[in-house]
């Protein structure tokens, strides 16, 4: 018989956190034992948590040996310290919060190796987004001229999105650094977007959107567009479920859901 895995959800009061709460509550092999949120009241049932779940407002309140898995849907300013705390306390993190720098990711991976703790950081838990990144990486072999447009809800704190940046990194692996229009002149500052190794990234923040991305490739006399749309945050939960089921098989922190599919 499988042992029930204990889960702490950081950011459980937010939209993604509540989706994660509902997911874990529906799984017989996992149980929410705690939640972390700086402003949450000590009323588990208000947030759909089990009646005996503990609620913490800061990291220093969390006791040792409380949980096996740490799900993080918090904020860019909190995620690094949260994941570092989890790893150093031998808790396997499943991280959907974006905003970590390359240096922070590298440092957390080193900590995970030292502590021998597996975990996953996923720029996007949606299967369609993972496939978009995979297809874009393959297309980059044939179309070196490419730009990315990502569109998200108005409350998203970081730009570009973690998914767009991850897409750019994967594309860059399959093509040399390449500037499509090296002599262009901007008459309006930053009108051409951010630049990652010659890949322009454009970020849109508007009400009515959830999470969407287009990768536009241009060639001589032809073009290719790959688009992904997440219309409901529930779409991300299929990836979180996979991560919950497979995180025990990891020996270190990995970046990207595609590495465990």
From Swiss-Prot:
CDD domains attached to this UniProt entry: DHDPR_N
Cited Gene3D superfamilies: Dihydrodipicolinate Reductase, domain 2 (3.30.360.10), NAD(P)-binding Rossmann-like Domain (3.40.50.720)
Summary of the function given for this chain in its UniProt record: Catalyzes the conversion of 4-hydroxy-tetrahydrodipicolinate (HTPA) to tetrahydrodipicolinate.
GO cellular component, one term: cytosol
One GO molecular-function entry: 4-hydroxy-tetrahydrodipicolinate reductase
UniProt keywords, alphabetically: Amino-acid biosynthesis, Cytoplasm, Diaminopimelate biosynthesis, Lysine biosynthesis, NAD, NADP, Oxidoreductase
Pathway(s) of this molecule: Amino-acid biosynthesis; L-lysine biosynthesis via DAP pathway; (S)-tetrahydrodipicolinate from L-aspartate: step 4/4
Disulfide bonds: none
Protein's gene: dapB
The protein's name: 4-hydroxy-tetrahydrodipicolinate reductase
Catalytic activity entry: (S)-2,3,4,5-tetrahydrodipicolinate + NAD(+) + H2O = (2S,4S)-4-hydroxy-2,3,4,5-tetrahydrodipicolinate + NADH + H(+); (S)-2,3,4,5-tetrahydrodipicolinate + NADP(+) + H2O = (2S,4S)-4-hydroxy-2,3,4,5-tetrahydrodipicolinate + NADPH + H(+)
Sequence positions that bind (S)-2,3,4,5-tetrahydrodipicolinate: 153, 162-163
Protein's UniProt keywords contain NADP: yes
Residues at the active site: 152, 156
GO biological process: diaminopimelate biosynthetic process; lysine biosynthetic process via diaminopimelate
Family affiliation: Belongs to the DapB family.
InterPro entries found in the cross-reference section: DapB_C (IPR022663), DapB_N (IPR000846), DapB_N_CS (IPR022664), DHDPR_bac (IPR023940), NAD(P)-bd_dom_sf (IPR036291)
Enzyme Commission number: 1.17.1.8
Cellular localization per UniProt: Cytoplasm
Residues bound to NAD(+): 11-16, 96-98, 122-125
């Amino acid at each position: 018989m499988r042992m029930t895995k204990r889960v702490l959800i950081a950011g459980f009061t937010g939209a993604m956190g509540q989706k994660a709460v509902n997911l874990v509550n529906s799984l017989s092999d996992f149980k929410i034992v705690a939640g972390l949120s700086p402003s949450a009241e000590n009323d588990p049932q208000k947030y759909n948590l089990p009646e005996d779940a503990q609620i913490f407002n800061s990291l220093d309140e969390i006791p040792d040996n409380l949980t096996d898995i740490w799900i993080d849907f918090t904020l860019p300013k909190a995620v690094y310290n949260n994941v570092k705390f989890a790893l150093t306390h031998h808790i396997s993190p499943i991280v959907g919060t974006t905003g970590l720098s390359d240096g922070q990711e590298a440092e957390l991976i080193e900590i995970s190796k030292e502590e021998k703790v597996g975990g996953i950081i996923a720029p996007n838990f949606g299967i369609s987004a993972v496939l978009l990144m995979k297809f874009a990486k393959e297309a980059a072999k044939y179309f070196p001229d490419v730009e990315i447009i990502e569109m998200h809800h108005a409350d998203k704190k970081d730009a570009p999105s973690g998914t767009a940046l991850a897409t750019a990194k994967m594309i860059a692996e399959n093509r040399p650094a390449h500037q499509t229009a090296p002599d262009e002149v901007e008459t309006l500052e930053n009108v051409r977007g951010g630049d990652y190794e010659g890949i322009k990234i454009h970020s849109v923040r508007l009400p009515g959107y959830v999470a969407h991305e287009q990768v536009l490739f241009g060639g001589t006399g032809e073009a290719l567009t790959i688009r992904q749309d997440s219309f409901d945050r529930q779409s991300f939960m299929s990836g979180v479920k996979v991560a919950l089921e497979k995180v025990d098989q990891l020996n270190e922190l990995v970046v990207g859901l595609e590495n465990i599919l």
